[in-house]
Amino acid sequence: MSAANPETPNSTISREASTQSSSAAASQGWVLPEGKIVPNTVFVGGIDARMDETEIGSCFGRYGSVKEVKIITNRTGVSKGYGFVSFVNDVDVQKIVGSQIHFHGKKLKLGPAIRKQKLCARHVQPRPLVVNPPPPPQFQNVWRNPNTETYLQPQITPNPVTQHVQSAANPETPNSTISREASTQSSSAAASQGWVLPEGKIVPNTVFVGGIDARMDETEIGSCFGRYGSVKEVKIITNRTGVSKGYGFVSFVNDVDVQKIVGSQIHFHGKKLKLGPAIRKQKLCARHVQPRPLVVNPPPPPQFQNVWRNPNTETYLQPQITPNPVTQHVQAYSAYPHSPGQVITGCQLLVYNYQEYPTYPDSAFQVTTGYQLPVYNYQPFPAYPRSPFQVTAGYQLPVYNYQAFPAYPNSPFQVATGYQFPVYNYQPFPAYPSSPFQVTAGYQLPVYNYQAFPAYPNSPFQVATGYQFPVYNYQAFPAYPNSPVQVTTGYQLPVYNYQAFPAYPSSPFQVTTGYQLPVYNYQAFPAYPNSAVQVTTGYQFHVYNYQMPPQCPVGEQRRNLWTEAYKWWYLVCLIQRRD
């Protein structure tokens, strides 16, 4: 064994570090990962969302001078619940790990900070590699920015643990030497941050900036970094709606000391920025793997052909390649928000050209409903081939030219109700063939001018929808025959040319949907029987054209009040005279 693995100074140090790691965490009962202990640094777990870096640093100040507290966050800046505390001078990490620290009434989980070692190819048998494919065609919009390739590359992960195969198969070249030196510089540049950077080549004169707040814009960030050199460009990464993802890149015109910038502490708008070198991930060349037969996914089905309309797409997207036979057109569940053609409803039901949830105002059509997402002119779930328009899907699914939830006042038609959302001229679920218009969505939820559920044959208009969602001029549930107008909705929620929930006072019609929500000029819940007209909403609660909270009396009522007031005043005067 020793002949196969001759000891080197590095291996001896690593073994001693692993031994120290095991003993340091003995009190915690952990089995630590293989790797090298980061000196004078403590892993801290169980960090509550209320804790900030300043408080944690003051808590650990009893053990020595704290150099930095690093709370690990996700891309949006939300804490992942753990972090690292590094000290300026040498400290007894084993003693700190063995102590019991409670903070905000919560016990912190302590351990040594371990930098995992990468397993070199010569330590393992050569194994076939699984290459992650580039994003499928529906993700082409994330590549629309031609500058994106500077920062994003298809993810490549070897299976199971190694990222390179035998170094003998890859003789060193000047380029490989430069790349290795760049990686070394990357590791040292981020040492103060305690990061393990991805494999790749550093983009020169460019800094990664994380923890960007929504209030920060590119101009402010550029002026903040102007102290280090002439800023060429500030790029904040956003999603397709233009909302910041919380990170970006700052590039400089001239050569700058990226390592110095990364090591500095920059606070902006009261928030510490997370800095690091910009890494361009390396692509794994074909010569690094054994040739294997591949299963190539076919192009998207016809309804997805719109994603190929951009002639530049081939620059960034290639057919998906996965060495696994289980890859036929499968649309994942849940939806992918950054796809232009992601329409998933119910149980993995794909569609075409719709507005997702949440809605993106840059879409020509605003068609969104609830949780599962519906659209325009596609095969419903289940399909009704006899319908001229197929627009239904899953549980809550309506479409074309209607008012969503929440309401969008720019729609010419305001027809939306609560959770399930119906629309215009399509086959309902289930269908009512006796209706001239089939407009239903969800569980049996129809609207305009059709046979209601249940039907009221004595009503001039049949406009009711399942559990919630009614409209205009129909027989109520239960019916109030003495009312000239019947406007009620099952349990709650009326419709037709109305203002959605919450109400928008700018609407000429005030007909609200929600739980017990009023309609047009009426007395809300509970019912007021003295109303001239009974128009019910909510739990059958009368309304329409009634006396709002008591108003000032007029005419005879005013005279009677003055008479009563005079009587009381006269009695008071008599009592005062007797006294």
From Swiss-Prot:
Biological processes per GO annotation: 3'-UTR-mediated mRNA stabilization; cell differentiation; positive regulation of translational initiation; spermatogenesis
Tissue spec: Testis-specific. Expression restricted to premeiotic germ cells, particularly in spermatogonia (at protein level).
Annotated compartments: Cytoplasm; Nucleus
UniProt keyword Cytoplasm, yes or no: yes
InterPro entries the record matches: DAZ_dom (IPR043628), DAZ_RRM_vert (IPR037551), Nucleotide-bd_a/b_plait_sf (IPR012677), RBD_domain_sf (IPR035979), RRM_dom (IPR000504)
Disulfide topology: none
Domain DAZ residue range list: 332-355, 356-379, 380-403, 404-427, 428-451, 452-475, 476-499, 500-523, 524-547
Cellular-component GO terms for this entry: cytoplasm; nucleus; protein-containing complex
All copies of domain RRM, residue ranges: 40-115, 205-280
Pfam family, one: Daz
UniProt biased composition (Low complexity): 11-27, 176-192
Sample GO molecular function, one term: translation activator activity
Ranges of compositional bias, category Polar residues: 1-10, 163-175
Family listed: Belongs to the RRM DAZ family.
Its job: RNA-binding protein that plays an essential role in spermatogenesis. May act by binding to the 3'-UTR of mRNAs and regulating their translation.
PANTHER family listed in its UniProt record: BOULE-RELATED, DELETED IN AZOOSPERMIA PROTEIN 1-RELATED
Record: disease: Spermatogenic failure Y-linked 2: A disorder resulting in the absence (azoospermia) or reduction (oligozoospermia) of sperm in the semen, leading to male infertility.
Subunit architecture: Forms a heterodimer with BOLL and DAZL. Interacts with PUM2, DAZAP1, DAZAP2, DZIP1 and DZIP3.
Domain notes: The DAZ domains are essential and mediate the interaction with DAZAP1 and DAZAP2.
Other comment: DAZ genes are prone to deletions but also to duplications. In a population of infertile men, DAZ genes deletions are associated with oligozoospermia but an increased number of DAZ genes is not a significant risk factor for spermatogenic failure. The DAZ proteins (DAZ, DAZ2, DAZ4 and DAZ4) are all encoded by a strongly repeated region of the Y chromosome, in two clusters each comprising an inverted pair of DAZ genes. They are very similar, which gives their indidual characterization difficult. Thus, most experiments do not discriminate between the different members. One can therefore suppose that reported interactions with a DAZ protein involve all the 4 proteins.
Name under which the protein is recorded: Deleted in azoospermia protein 4
Native species: Homo sapiens
